[in-house]
Amino acid sequence: MATEKHPLVIGEFRASEDADDAPTVIAYGHFDVQPEAPLELWESPPFEPTVRDGWLYARGVADDKGQLYILLKAAALLAAEGALPVNVRFTCDGEEESGGHSIIDFLEADERGETRA
């Protein structure tokens, strides 16, 4: 979805039964990151994931792509089993590190009337 700044990515899994009457849960995540400076403090290039001592290092690797993936995978598995009790709408933006205004605007103006902030 186009916004004044960065796009808002929206996807949805519908409830396995009675989706039109099921509540909708929103899972929010972001794909932007803080600047990598100062570069001299990095032990490896910030945008090249590197494993050291069993840990993954890269700019943005822990904030919050993994958490959103877990929610996405769980919803997909429940949907595949016919066991998803609610609609799950995933929203992901590129503005969280700078205020996240587009997600707020979307929630307040959702033309489907399904979400309200």
Show the residue positions of the predicted features.
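Acidic/His- and Gly-rich active-site-bordering loop/insert found
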Residues: 1-61, 78-88, 94
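Acidic/histidine-rich catalytic neighborhood of metal-dependent amide-processing enzymes
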Residues: 64-117
